[in-house]
Regions:
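Alpha-helical transmembrane segments of multi-pass membrane transport proteins
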Residues: 1-451
């Protein structure tokens, strides 16, 4: 049995374990551990585990993850989502479909301090859904807009999945944060346009609300100021080169906690709950990272990434077509697993293929398969991959965001939620097409701020 055949058998076993609902971290560790033992012996496996147990968990860039998770946990507990939705509803609520637009805007704002799609969908679902139903919005538009708005938490910086992608492909985290900003803004604009088109076709789906008084408008708008200041200090400081993401995340935690204690009566019990929740979430993330690294070593020893790259070159397939096929594969994976696991499992296979098609790891723009340097390809593919990961969160039949919102909106059938999310899915596909055709949407801002 060849090493490549062993690797393929390992992949099949991994898919089977995922299908029977074994936790992805344990599935990757089991398959990777057995594979390394078969190819190189148990002694090599034990040596790798000993090295990884320290080396993987002591990577400096990974220390940013617990901080961003804690920042999101604190933001949820002090009611920032409620303030954001109240302000956005004061701005948009008088428009037809305006309350749904307010939900999208609030999701974008909360994603800027949370970094998690499921947390954004869950938090804003509880805040905005009662108001949407009170305003007599259709169940499909109310739940569909919230499920779609939740995906903004993945791409808008800071993003946990974006950090993990940057570490996998050895990209600069700050550069990835820069690259994600314009595509994130584009998503918000496309979602707002989608809602406008829905209510244009079906006015009853999103009735017009009453304009608010000037005093109420100003009072509601003040609720945005804390989020805006936190975003400017954390992300603006990173963009300005004042500090790197790890201290920026710590500063963000301090600011959110200080605001919570000073203005919102954050209790020590709630802080303790947020810290314990962060410990559990971070432990899960690190365990998945450890399992992914074990699996990656097995696949490398089996020669699968190189075999895939060699096959791609020998196929003569145009690089852009290969990229589209890989993105479609990511969409399919999104129906089986969560976004973090998908990135950890797929990127180590897909990235070497794209590097070879582009001309190698040190390829410049001249003569490159994708007409850009491999460093730029790293950024461009990362943004595309994360958008496709977003698609998986709202794609039938296993869109996790849809299940989260459906668990909150018990009076709305899940089929209505999936029906409501379809127009937003079309908007996401349009965004993928725009970034495929105009890579500058992802590359322009890093080029301008890179100096």
């Amino acid at each position: 049995v060849t090493a490549v055949a062993t690797g393929l058998a390992g992949l099949a076993a991994l898919c089977a374990l995922i299908a029977i609902r074994m936790p992805i971290a344990y599935a990757m560790m089991l398959v990777g551990g057995i594979g390394i033992s078969l190819l190189s012996g148990p002694a090599v496996l034990l040596s790798q585990i000993k090295t990884l147990a320290y080396g993987q968990f002591s990577i400096y860039d990974l220390s940013v993850l617990p901080m961003f998770v804690l920042m999101g946990g604190l933001a949820t507990r002090i009611g920032l989502s409620r303030d954001l939705f109240r302000a956005a509803n004061a701005w948009f609520g008088w428009l037809r479909g305006g309350t749904a637009m307010a939900a999208i805007a609030a999701c974008a704002g909360f994603g800027a301090v949370c970094g998690s799609s499921l947390a954004t969908a869950s938090t804003l679902g509880r805040v905005a859904l009662p108001e949407l139903r009170r305003a007599r919005y259709s169940g499909a538009l109310a739940t569909g807009s919230l499920a779609a708005g939740g995906v903004l938490g993945i791409l808008i910086p800071p993003s946990v999945v974006l950090v993990v992608y940057a570490i996998i492909v050895e990209a600069n985290i700050v550069t990835m944060f820069m690259a994600a900003l314009l595509p994130g803004v584009l998503a918000v604009l496309l979602f707002l346009l989608t809602i406008a088109l829905i209510v244009l076709v079906s006015p009853a789906a999103g009735p017009r609300g009453e304009p608010v008084a000037a005093a109420e408008f100003l009072a509601a708008s003040r609720g945005v100021i804390p989020v805006l200041l936190i975003f400017l200090v954390v992300i603006g400081g990173i963009y300005a080169g004042l500090y790197n993401p790890t201290p920026a995340a710590a500063i963000g935690v301090f600011l959110v906690a200080a605001y919570g204690f000073g203005r919102r009566g954050l209790r020590v019990r709630e802080l303790r709950e947020a810290i314990l929740e962060t410990a559990g979430t971070s432990g899960m993330i690190y365990l998945i990272l450890f399992g992914a690294e074990i699996l990656k070593i097995f696949m490398s020893r089996a020669g699968l990434p190189q075999a895939a790259a060699d096959w791609a070159l020998a196929s003569g397939m145009p690089p852009m077509l290969m990229l589209v096929l890989l993105l479609l594969a990511l969409v399919a994976l999104g129906c089986l697993m969560d976004s973090l696991s998908m990135i950890l499992l797929a990127v180590p296979f897909f990235w070497p293929v794209l590097v070879e098609l582009n001309g190698g790891a040190y390829q410049g723009a001249d003569g490159a398969g994708f007409a850009m340097s491999t460093e730029d390809l790293k950024i461009w593919f990362g943004i595309l991959a994360l958008i496709v990961v977003e698609l998986g969160l709202i794609t039938p039949p296993v869109g996790l965001n849809v299940f989260v919102i459906s668990s909150i909106a018990e009076d709305v059938p899940m089929r209505d939620t999936f029906r409501g999310v379809m127009p937003f899915l079309a908007a996401e596909l349009l965004r993928v097409g725009l970034i495929l055709g105009l890579p500058a949407l992802a590359l322009w801002l890093p080029g301008q701020l890179g100096g």
